């Protein structure tokens, strides 16, 4: 089962981890992590060296989402097998 893990670059030591995070494609913007789950659910969270805090989640596309989300000019582009979705990201 996929694990979300923060690793200290200089030492390779794990700082924290989240078990059973799930299969996803991730995008980091500042301290916000956007994770498009394989189920089509979008998870927004904050990441710091101290840990992960989930902010929200929403089903935005169908299952089978395997493409990398793209963020440009305050818009998030996400696709699944059948559609392309554009969301405003504040």
Please state what every model-predicted region is.
Residues 1-90:
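Noncatalytic, solvent-exposed loop/strand surfaces
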